[in-house]
Amino acid sequence: MKPIRFFLAVIVSMLTLGLVSCQQPQEEAQTQDQAEDQAQDQTQAQERVQAMDENGAPLFQVDPFWPGPLPNRWSMQQVTGIHVDHMDIVWFLNRPNGAEGDEIAGGVEEPYRMACCTKSPEVIAMDVDANIVHAWGDADHHPNWPRGLQTVIADRDGYVWVGGLAPQDSILKFTREGEFVWDFGRRPPEGVQMEEDNAETEVLTQKGRFQLDQDEREIYIINWKRVLVYDMDTGDFKRGWGGHGMPLEEITNDPIPPYEWDGTRPPEEPNFVPAMHFIETSDDGLVYVGERGQNRIQVFQKDGTWVQDIYVAEWTPADRLGPTQCAGVTTRKELPVCGVMYKMAISKDPEQNYLYVADSGNSSVWIVNRLSGETLGSFGGNGRYAGQLHWINAIATDSLGNIYTGEVEHAKRIQKFEPVWE
């Protein structure tokens, strides 16, 4: 029997080696097929004409079946960030901080609930058909894993950047498979509460809202009342500016005074008005910064030269009203949600004609003409049914014209809105 067993072992080994040797070409062929399918879909999307409403706003409709339940009984939690990469892979953060007691269960402590729901990886990537291609990350994944996850960006070089807003959170760089590569650092000392100092560029808090400029190899970070730009490879500081392009040393470190809401736009303020909630860059070299405290987008050139202000739903009570009049995600539930500028995405048509503004205050996505700043229309509306929105806190677009939204608080989901074609 021993010679027979040996012969069988040799045969199995040879077959295994054959499978391994064939696996890489098969994977490469699959990747090539996906790229070809993506190019074909992009061509078809460009050839079709998207339907418009009477005001010239492009029309969208929700796909009520996308993405469907997550695999492995993973619990869908707060979707705080979404990014669609150059291959139309949708990356999103599934932050479990606000999980209810009945939403994540099972394990050793609750074996009687194993059929219910489990904690998922906190970084998930799926294709346009909701097939999961990557999933990794949590507090056990890396010792400095962000506790206040806010932003995920997958660059075209094959790396994924993750950042959070907790005091000790920074920006971490991983491979697409989740292998750690680099830590931006610049954390304050443990347990030290930093006082606002808008001229300080070496030690930073709340670095979780950032953007990458891969052409210039730069990281844009917003916090307090400024934009800071660092080298994307070395982390060295390069430049920064405040509201309307003011120098860092001229930015006030005092709180922006609240105002009495009267149904009109907040009083004009040259400084950025916290919370600064997003920063995006366009292909023609413009930088867009959203201020939840002012219902305003300030537009700049990359050197910090101010270009224009864009107000959206300016009559909305702004976050500048303060905590006595505005709700938080987990606190002051009896109060309304304040502010418009939660996140923003830029359309991926060749001219990048539209800004899509995710507005939690009005549970809507506003469609804005990028060059004129004119609001053309909106979709959404408060609720938890498909196509409605509640505490929207993330938005992204792909090359096919789809819009992806993420919700926090108790909504806890990601949705896909598809173009309506004529």
Describe the predicted segments one by one.
Residues 18-21:
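C-terminal motif of bacterial Sec signal peptides marking the signal peptidase cleavage site
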Residues 23, 28-30, 41-422:
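Eukaryotic scaffold repeat domains enriched in small/polar residues
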Residues 34-38:
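Intrinsically disordered, low-complexity repeat regions of secreted/extracellular protein precursors
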